[in-house]
């Protein structure tokens, strides 16, 4: 896609941008981007087990996140829902100062901007344009269509320059019914066939999703199974990471553990956190159990023996093992390289 087709835009002509985008994105005369490699290892991307949200207007909480940065994979400095309307500019100034002057250790540093439709995004991007090399990416809320990513991409290029803009990773928040429906198009978005997608992860925002759909939250969270599974399936199919919802009962450690392990079992690669008390439990839950690791090791070892003997399926501890199970075992062992196994037995 010729980038000259699109003019750098501002909020006032967003509708024109949407129309131009649709003409090009859905045109049969334009070659669509080639399919993602479905076998792509999600660990080619940074670990994002703990995705820690911090209000950008709260200096005390920013300092706390910095102090805990060795236990956090991604620190998200929020200008959106975590900041009151009359504190937005204060948050921008505080974030700008903090990312330049403070050390966040090895943690990935992200800024959560306001949504495309909020009327506040442009001021956020103006701030980011002054610090593009100090952050790793941006969290984009309320992504419902690929043109939301398109608009932000062009805005960043205008304000930050092509090179700095291209180096910023995107994390798209799934917060509504239409967002879930449009996940395939959102995941497939890139500025052109020769431009790698900046999208790295999908983030499920359960409370916003419930507010949009009218779903009533229950302790079991079964009402969210479809949406959570959709996020994971689309993310994995496109080589992206999937970040699970916030556990709002942040003082209930057992509820957090249960919800986090459910996310692990569904295939999520990390979980959002809003309180320091959640960090240790989330980190621990994303480590495979010692029991699972030992079983996976045994499968791989036995498979090598049976393959050398020209045998296919085999049995371990009364369970039939075939190639899908061998692939599962190898994936568990690859995860163990990054997440040392935990001592207790596998949670049910």
Feature roles, as predicted:
Residues 2-348:
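Expand to "…catalyze enediolate/carbanion chemistry for C-C bond making/breaking, isomerization
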């Amino acid at each position: 896609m010729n980038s000259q087709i699109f003019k750098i835009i501002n909020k006032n002509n967003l509708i024109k941008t949407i129309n131009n985008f649709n003409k090009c994105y859905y045109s049969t005369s334009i070659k669509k981007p080639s399919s993602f490699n479905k076998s792509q290892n999600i660990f080619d991307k940074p670990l994002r087990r703990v995705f820690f949200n911090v209000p950008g207007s709260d200096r005390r909480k920013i300092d706390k996140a910095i102090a805990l940065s060795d236990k956090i994979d991604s620190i998200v400095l929020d200008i959106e829902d975590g900041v009151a309307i009359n504190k937005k500019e204060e948050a921008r100034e505080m974030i700008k100062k903090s990312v330049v002057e403070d050390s966040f250790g090895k943690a990935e540093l992200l800024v959560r901007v306001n949504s495309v439709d909020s009327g506040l995004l442009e001021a956020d991007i103006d701030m980011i344009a002054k610090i593009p090399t100090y952050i790793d990416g941006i969290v984009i809320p309320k992504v419902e269509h690929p043109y939301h990513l398109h608009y932000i991409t062009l805005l960043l290029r205008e304000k930050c320059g092509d090179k700095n803009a291209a180096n910023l990773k995107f994390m798209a928040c799934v917060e509504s019914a239409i967002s879930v429906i449009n996940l395939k198009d959102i995941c497939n978005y890139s500025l052109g066939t020769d431009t790698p997608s900046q999208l790295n992860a999908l983030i499920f925002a359960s409370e916003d999703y419930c507010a949009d759909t009218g779903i009533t939250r229950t302790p079991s969270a079964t009402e969210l199974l479809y949406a959570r599974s959709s996020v994971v399936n689309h993310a994995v199919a496109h080589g992206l990471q999937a970040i699970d919802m916030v556990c709002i009962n942040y003082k209930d450690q057992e509820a957090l553990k249960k919800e986090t392990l459910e996310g692990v079992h569904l295939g999520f690669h990390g979980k959002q956190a809003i309180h320091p008390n959640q960090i240790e439990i989330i980190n621990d839950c994303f480590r495979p159990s010692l029991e699972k690791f030992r079983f996976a090791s045994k499968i791989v070892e036995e498979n090598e023996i049976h393959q050398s003997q020209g045998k296919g399926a085999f049995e371990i501890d009364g369970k039939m093992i075939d190639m899908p199970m061998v692939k599962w075992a190898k994936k568990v062992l690859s995860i163990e390289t990054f997440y040392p196994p935990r001592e207790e037995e596998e949670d049910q």
